[in-house]
Amino acid sequence: MLFRYLVWLFRFIEVKNVASISLLVIGSNSLTTAISNNTSTTILPTTSSNSLMTAIPNNTSTTISPTTSSNYLTSAISTNISDKEEDTPFSTDKTVFDGLSPITLYRTIRSTLNDTSTKTMTDHILTRPYRPTTVIFHSDTPQPVKNATQGNIIKKTYRQVLTFFIQPNPLFPCFKNHEVFLNLANILNTILCIILIKNV
């Protein structure tokens, strides 16, 4: 299944003519992967570790930020996330809830748009040192996207990626709506990336 997903993913990237991609590493407590000494733009997954950890040590690639994982679900968060409804939230999805909610992910992504430093914060069990490059997000209304000239197209592209997992999918019949983001994180953790589209 993972191989079929990867084939779809890279075909999707090719069709959308993505100029460049970067990585947002997501660790989880169910899937573990290690990539060591990556010195090129090629990502070569190695044998999974027995410990609940994901690591990219000694990484010199310009598209990957070195980071260290923990034994629970982790993601990129800067220090300026608040509980105020200052930003336009994700589309309301009553089936996605608890700590890993759309609004939490939305604030996480929005908070990294103009952040050029590596910061760490804990919010809804999400924490990750991360140096963002280009970030896209899913929203019902137009919002600024760093280094992007076609924000609406980028958001539409990202929406399609999410929809691929949210809708009933023969590749992943075990998916349940309320588990979609957790499962998505687990799958993306296996290949160690979320697509961050730049200059589409």
UniProtKB/Swiss-Prot annotation:
Induction: Expressed in the late phase of the viral replicative cycle. Sequence repeats lie at residues 28-48, 49-69, 70-91. Disulfide bonds: none annotated. It comes from the Viruses. The keyword Repeat applies. Keywords: Late protein, Repeat. The keyword Repeat applies. Belongs to the asfivirus I196L family. This is Late protein I196L.
